[in-house]
Structures are given as C-alpha cells and as structure tokens.
C-alpha cells in the first residue's frame, strides 16, 4: 500500500490504509526498502534510548570492584539476575557496542554520539595485540574501522592496521586460511568456521 502511495502521492487513501494495517517487523531486513522515513527515524530514536540506558548502566558497572579488577569495560548483554554483563576488551563481542554508537552517530550526526563512540572505542584499543582470536576482524573493524570511515583520523587507521598485522599471524599458508580456534586441539587439527568470513574484511582493507 505504501509503495503504491509513493507512486501516486495523491492517493492518500492508500496511506491511511497502510497506517491502519501495517505490521512492522524490524528483524526483516527487506522492511527498510519500503517503510516511511519516519519509521526509520523512530527506530533510531528507540535505539538511542536503549543505548543511553546501556551507557548509564555500563558507567555504574565499571565502578564495581570485580569489573575493575578484571578490566571489564564494555557492555555485552544482560545476566540472568537482570544486571548488566560487561566484558574485557579481548572478548569477541567487544567491538559491537562502540560500533553501534558509531552507527547512531552516522545517522544522527549528533556530536553527543560521536563523543560516546570515541570514548567506548578507545577502551578496547589493547585488543589490537590479541593473537588468540580470529574474531579480531569484526572486533576492531566495527569499532576503529567505522571510526576511521566516519572521521578520517589517522589514529584509528593505525589501530586497524596493527589489528590486521596481529590477525594475519593466525594465517596458515598450507591451509590458506586463518585459524578459528585454539582450544580442543585434541579434536580439531585446524578448525575453520564460517565466522572467519566476517573477519576477512579487515585483512582485505588493510592490504
């Protein structure tokens, strides 16, 4: 109905029907092809509210003694007791939160989100030396890579390049792939899982 209205804006009756009967599933990646711009704005507004609450909870969690001792700095998920789970920079999910902040900044161009993205991104810088994971690609590319894409600042680029140098140490020329996991060596000789594909983007970009 909305697509018909776009073709003929005079048919406001179609727009009224669309608004009355629409069912939006944000999990449907094709949904954004035909939803109204207002709906995208509303989705980002909702995301901003969630991220602001997450940042508030994260700031509180970072002050807890156990998290400070174990250098847990980035929010990841909710624990069973309802508390916020914060993680070490080496956790494979560490780049998702700062990456989400950069995505919101890219859409809103609001300096508030830029500053929050900068702060949360640099919290995981040390991961650029972490050779124990194949997930370094999307850990650092979603955060520092997105930061460089949006700002052009050399400092972000340098981190991504070092991350790529670290990740390529997991490459085996005989297998022609980076190694996925280091554990369970008694079961797997050289594990390569499909997630590897998400980590190659940073390597291709770096070359």
Where are the regions that the model predicts?
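Glycan-recognition and catalytic cores of secretory/periplasmic carbohydrate-active enzymes
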Residues: 1-207
